[in-house]
Amino acid sequence: MSARIELNLEADVRPPGEDCRALVARIAASPEFQRASRLRAFLAYVVDRKLADCPDEITEVLIGHRVFGLPIDYNPGDNSIVRTQARTLRDRLERYFRGEGAHEPVILEIPRGGYVPVFHLREPVSQHMPVPVSHHGTATVRERPPTRRHWLYLGASAAGLSGIALMRALRTAPTANIAATYSPARVELESSDANLTQAFSQAKQRAMQCVYGGDPIGQWYASDPISRVFCMRDVAHESFGAAVLGLEHHTENMLRRFAASAAASRKWCGFWTITKDGFPSPDTYRDNTDFGYCLPANFDLVRACYQQLRWTGNRAYLDAVFSGFYDHSVTSYVDAWDRERTGWMKANAAFRRVHASYNQRPPQFATSADLVGAQYAAYLAYAGIQDLKGEPGSLSRRMAAEYRAKAAALRSRFDSDWWNAAENRFYSGILPDGSLSSEYVDQSNVYALWFGLPAAGPKIEASLDQMERNRPHYDSTYSYFPEVFARYGRNDRAYQGILEIAGQSSNYPRGETAFAALGAIASGLMGVDPDVPNRIIETLPRLTGEVAWVRLSRLPVGPNEIAVEHHGTTATSFTNQNGPPVQWRPVFQSNGKRFAHAVMTIRGGETKRATLA
């Protein structure tokens, strides 16, 4: 009889190989599979169908049709390609787990006589999860971990498990998701301004053309309607607009894949692009020494995950896969790319396709303003995540305070060391020879503002003026403009930017501008700022003279659908259209000062109003 291994479902245990798809990605990246695209597709398909609890789709005929492109009515007796490829796949899996994957505690195999993959443990898992080590070399412990699905009983034959229980154990989606299950794209906008209404409609239509399902990767969206890959930077940026459309499950799926892909063998970089089949794109990944990446991406992803947690309340973003990624991104990742311990992360010439900036054109920086900005934003996001994990006085709360202090120190140093007084703007980056580059690089400077790096004051205003004078080379960079201008009070410029990028979305091949327009309308123009874990939603009207009133309705926020209606910048109404009671904090701005009302409780179906006194 096969040995059975039982794990405590409620204990804070992270068995190795918890994310099956991460295991498949490592297998696909190994020398045994790198140049075997059909075997990778075969493996991705059968694992995906198993995780989707669809074993009836793992048949010879369907594999032949969906993986190898054979007609749906082909006769397996006349074509043995599936059986032949299955034998090769089994052999290569066996070689992987004997060789490069000899360290893998979880083994994946496809038993002879069928095509349904099975997972089992090479050896019993310890009941105590290894404690993560901080960059100071001291152990850290997370308080109050969220409940997760764990591997239940895994053995050579998964004996003792029902099929349903096994599938639940293998799924990566956690149980603690409190987000609503409303259909995507129910959100609507009405306004006195026909241009704004049209812009919203165009952006919504274009964005939904970039949304996919039914691929081995699961639910996902891309930066253009014909893409078959998704990119880490694009997803981090598009996730704000995707939240407006109710695509929280698509977003979590993609962010999880990126988080799981970060590895010590690549100095904690993840995969820059992932295909619809769940593998790193060969254009950006050849092996662990030759891959394309931009160093701000890890930090951008940490920030995006935290924003999704605040918007959706989905505590999956606190599980082991994500938490491990956050921990490594603010510790091991920083150390790996700051070898000289100067406090600035730097690109390493040994990794020729790893860039310090999202800007990949000359000049090539060793360190960039957008990298520093992303690191600053990630430290603040990490602090917010730690706040959600611990009680007052706990280690998590102390870590939150530590990383807020780190963020403040980074901002202060940037403010003093990177200011170009001669040109009244910040430098864009540090060159490989250690000098500050005098060239203005739009991506570096715009993203630094996007991440909120510069402190408020005259330098911010000068930086915004510089943005106004320097139209970016890339429309994708320009798509960041509206929200940046809205955040810093230039509402007229934000409004014009929204109309421009939404108009681009109707004829521009990339859908990124569409997602950006939706995000800028909701969080910029409407000022919707949810904090679902704490049951508070804040609003701040940033309308212009062209817009007398605007109403955004059926907006999914956590388990609720809400409607927010602004009349100018002095009156707001809030409706809880669906869901449990929420707390609303109306905020207004006048003459550069913020005025916040007392928090109101809004029950389901109820509407309340607030005005600037």
Spans of model-derived segments:
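Low-complexity, Ser/Thr/Pro/Gly-enriched N-terminal "stalk/linker" regions
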Residues: 173-230, 253, 413, 418-419
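An N-terminal, helix-rich hydrophobic module
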Residues: 2-125
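Active-site acid/base region of carbohydrate-active enzymes
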Residues: 183-205, 245, 258-271, 306-370, ...
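Non-catalytic C-terminal accessory modules of carbohydrate-active enzymes
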Residues: 491-613
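N-terminal export signals
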Residues: 144, 150-171
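The feature captures the catalytic groove of carbohydrate-active enzymes
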Residues: 217-228, 270-300, 315, 331-404, ...
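Active-site core of glycosidic bond-cleaving carbohydrate-active enzymes
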Residues: 199-201, 228-264, 320, 324-331, ...
